[in-house]
Amino acid sequence: MNQAFICDAIRTPFGRYGGALSSVRADDLAAIPLRALMARNPNVDWQAVTDVLYGCVNQAGEDNRNVAHMASLLAGLPHQVPGATINRLCGSGMDALGTAARAIRAGEARLMIAGGVESMSRAPFVMPKAESGFARNPQIFDTTIGWRFINPVMKAMYGVDAMPETAENVATDYKIEREAQDRMALASQLKAVAAQKSGALAEEITPVSIPQKKGEAIVVDKDEHPRETSLEKLAQLKGVVRPDGTVTAGNASGVNDGACAILLADEATAKLHGLTPRARVVGMATAGVPPRVMGIGPAPATEKVLALTGLKLAQMDVIELTEAFAAQGIAVLRLLGLQDDDPRVNPNGGAIALGHPLGASGARLVTTATNQLHRTGGRYALCTMCIGVGQGIAVVIERV
């Protein structure tokens, strides 16, 4: 069986909602890391790419009509290279990576690009068509995040809790204290700022030039979301679901814009194109959980991928766990028997600080983990995420 290797990975900075990247179309944003991959690897015959797989969650606006292939064409990849867009909600970018690796291991592909994109700032409003000629009270939905066009049967069967509500459910069911959530949020911010200062995050970012109506273009070269805070400031924030709730804007991930791309190949193809393998994709697994507590999804997904690969959690030198909400992050750690402040977890900050552009986040976790393994000399990394409507996804990679 062939092995799938990550040979290069790059992302844009992650922009705040309405921030520096908000003027960039989603398809153009998706093309930026692809273009960077091409520039960084001049010896590759890009027509040899079997497929481009990109995760994207919204797909209701400028990311419509298969944004993976649109981005491929916009980036300048040969038109012979196909592309497909994957939607497993928040796990989309990670699913794209795992699916690409599976194709290589199966011998059906030799050179693949995987990644993801999300422009939450540019998510459109949508409305359904009238069911009759004189229909009244049309609904309008903001597609930025969450439910739209709700199926009443689904609502009756499982409920349609908003994402912050699912986090409150997790906090209640698993007794996750408010102070513990705020401590995780503060740690995420502090680690992210330290990683920015040390240059650790800069290794994985390609700068984005934003044209201005007047004057020179603005160059964005770092994530916009990290911010200074303290436990005292975090404790003053009110709950977003209810005033006495524990989930706040301070201990939840951001609404963000960004894109990420990863180049994968088997060993022979990497050598043929002058590429250096950096990490082997060992395996991927997904799992389902009740939608009302979707945030615990990484726990069973992690257990499945470890069973699949024959590895143990103790062997993981780096753990990249998406911080959709601190409540769910802590619940997952405790379900896996880990401490809230395990030093292996998100050593460069997590989504609370760096942001969570949905379709891109999974690819970002794998990119960050690959670089961290090489900085520290670690062998294995676990990357895992929760997924809306009740799923989890996990990938294990090995440094080479």
Residue positions per predicted region:
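Conserved active-site "lid/cap" helical segment
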Residues: M1-A71, A75, P82, T166-R178, ...
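N-terminal extracellular/periplasmic Venus flytrap/periplasmic-binding protein-like
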Residues: R11, S23, D27-I32, N43, ...
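Conserved catalytic cysteine-centered active-site region
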Residues: V24, C56-L111, T144-W147, M157-M163, ...
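Active-site pocket-lining segment
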Residues: Y54, E168, E204, Q212, ...
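Active-site-proximal alpha-helical scaffold in enzymes
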Residues: I86-E118, A171-A200, A261-A268, L333-R334, ...
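Flexible glycine-/small-residue-enriched beta->alpha junction loops
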Residues: R105, L111-N169
